[in-house]
């Protein structure tokens, strides 16, 4: 026997066959040939047996036969069409990656064990949406059918490689130590193209200034996962609205750890005092709009009224909502509780599209159905400020179906007038219109046909659409045609406080991204108020 095989040899004289040997065993690891393990053999094993049937393409016992023989078996094969595939790809590439990055002199046992622990720990963490999408499931969680990470899990490169590198350093075989682990993990994520500079910058900035963020639909699995992920990443201090017992049941089902996360039941008796305080403030604020204290108090049983009031009264810094409620209702609550910034008639939303051609800012994608000239002007002002908020310089095109007065009636006129108002108030701003979208995005075409434009020689990055249908349809069309494009939004602009929205289609990562925006928004708001 080779030295490796001698580790598994025995001097027992009472076993001569696999059936005798496996009786009462806890673990079976097979690397031999197909169909050598029978259902009777499997039934003879201890409770909750671990069976790794790794012969390929036919395992020692098929997955179907194993599961039919006993329900408590923890089963793995080497095949991708069954749960818990054991594949070299979840280990070897990242072991080599970590070893090479520290110029390790050897790959030792400490490093191998570090890989094992990193992979095992990863299986217990919430599963990224990208993994669920690949396998067409919604709720992969640690358990009998998922105790080994999937080979497509993008976190393997960061967690396993970093664990290997650290183990190499700790065991003395590394020649080039790593000092900044977060920078190292960012480098690894970039190798896979997992995150862009934009999202990385948002998350990094939010981590520097984490704020208290209220998540309205705490019992929604997607929002709950996002809140836990945001806390894990250090982006915010989550506050979940909802019934604590229900939230904990959902968290237990999803194997999510709620430790350190505040849960607020706005309908509970112990919140009577805050409901009264919030109602008094709302009734006084909207006294001339038909609000009585009793009506305002009743509204505080609703998550959006209560959650936004928490932000309004300083009990939280930002609010995320939208998965369950209609936008029209949420918009009304935001106007009632938070209010629109002084000097504006409305507020709006923007989506950021990070494409291969560059970053584009699109407005208004959610709020104003049929904006008039004044509302379009407000949207343009808010858009310019929001682009600057992201440390970019706005180059703005206000869009229509006509170009620079070719249609002197209908909606192009209000766009043209809004452009004139913006150019008068902000002569230094690069903004022009009305124009068709192809002229906005094709600098050469625009410069040749309309050389008088203020945008001559400039690449447009901000698109203001004439109404909600066109803006919303445009970003969703681009999203459908360019699935590789990263989209962040909707980003609220124009309310007095950081209130941000999601929709029923938002993924966990979408909500985490908008949470990072909300955190930065809240931090900037604090800086302004302290000046």
Predicted regions: what they are:
Residues 3-14, 74-81, 96-105, 145-150, ...:
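Short beta-alpha connecting loops at secondary-structure transitions
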Residues 175-178, 184-457, 461-531:
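Anion-binding alpha/beta catalytic cores of soluble intermediary-metabolism enzymes, centered on
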Residues 26, 49, 73, 317, ...:
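Conserved acidic residues
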Residues 53-161, 168, 504-506, 514, ...:
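Adenosine-phosphate binding glycine-rich loop
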Residues 1-60:
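Rossmann-like NAD(P)-binding element
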Residues 25, 74, 91-99, 124, ...:
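Short acidic (Asp/Glu) and glycine-rich catalytic loops that position anionic groups and cofactors
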Residues 139-145, 156-195:
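Aromatic-enriched
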Residues 46-50, 70-73, 497:
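A short helix->loop->beta-strand "cap" motif at the edges of active sites that frequently abuts
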């Amino acid at each position: 026997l080779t030295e490796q095989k001698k580790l598994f040899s025995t001097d027992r004289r009472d076993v001569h066959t696999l059936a005798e040997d496996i009786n009462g065993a806890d673990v079976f690891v097979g690397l031999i040939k197909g169909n050598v393990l029978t259902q009777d053999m499997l039934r003879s094993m201890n409770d909750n047996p671990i069976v790794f049937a790794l012969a390929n393409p036919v395992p020692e016992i098929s997955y179907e036969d194993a599961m039919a023989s006993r329900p408590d078996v923890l089963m793995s094969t080497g095949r991708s069409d069954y749960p818990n595939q054991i594949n070299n790809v979840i280990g070897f590439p990242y072991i080599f990656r970590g070893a090479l990055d520290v110029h390790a002199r050897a790959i030792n046992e400490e490093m191998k064990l570090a890989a094992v622990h990193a992979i095992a720990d990863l299986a217990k963490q919430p599963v990224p949406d990208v993994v669920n999408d690949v396998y067409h499931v919604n709720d992969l969680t640690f358990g009998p059918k998922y105790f080994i990470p999937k080979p497509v899990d993008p976190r393997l490169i960061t967690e396993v490689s970093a664990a290997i590198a650290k183990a190499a350093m700790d065991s003395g075989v590394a020649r080039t130590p790593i000092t900044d682990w977060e920078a190292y993990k960012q480098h690894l994520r970039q190798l896979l193209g997992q995150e862009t500079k934009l999202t990385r910058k948002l998350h990094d900035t939010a981590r520097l200034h984490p704020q208290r963020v209220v998540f309205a639909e705490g019992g929604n699995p997607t929002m709950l996962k996002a809140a836990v992920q945001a806390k894990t990443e250090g982006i915010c201090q989550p506050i979940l609205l909802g019934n604590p017992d229900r939230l904990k049941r959902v968290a237990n089902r999803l194997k999510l750890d709620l430790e350190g996360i505040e849960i607020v039941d706005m309908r509970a008796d112990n919140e009577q005092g805050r409901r009264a305080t919030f109602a008094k403030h709302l009734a006084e604020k909207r006294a001339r709009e038909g609000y009585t204290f009793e009506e305002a108090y009743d509204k505080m049983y609703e998550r959006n009224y209560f959650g936004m009031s928490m932000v309004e009264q300083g009990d939280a810094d930002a609010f995320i909502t939208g998965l369950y409620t209609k936008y029209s209702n949420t918009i009304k609550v935001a106007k009632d509780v938070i209010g629109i910034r002084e000097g504006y008639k409305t507020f709006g939303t923007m989506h950021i599209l990070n494409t291969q051609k560059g970053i584009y800012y699109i407005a208004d994608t959610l709020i104003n159905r049929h904006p008039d000239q004044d509302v379009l002007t407000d949207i343009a002002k808010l858009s310019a400020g929001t682009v600057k908020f992201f440390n970019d310089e706005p180059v703005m095109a206000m869009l229509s179906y006509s170009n620079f007065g070719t249609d002197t009636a209908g909606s192009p006129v209000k766009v043209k007038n809004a452009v004139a108002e913006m150019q008068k108030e902000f002569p230094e701003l690069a903004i022009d219109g009305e124009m068709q979208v192809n002229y906005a995005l094709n600098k050469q075409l625009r410069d040749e046909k309309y050389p008088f434009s203020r945008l001559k020689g400039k690449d447009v990055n901000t698109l203001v659409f004439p109404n909600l249908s066109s803006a919303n349809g445009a970003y969703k069309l681009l999203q459908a045609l360019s699935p590789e494009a990263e989209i962040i939004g909707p980003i609220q602009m124009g309310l007095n406080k950081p209130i941000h929205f999601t929709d029923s289609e938002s993924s966990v990562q979408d909500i985490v991204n908008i949470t990072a925006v909300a955190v930065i928004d809240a931090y900037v708001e604090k800086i302004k108020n302290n000046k």
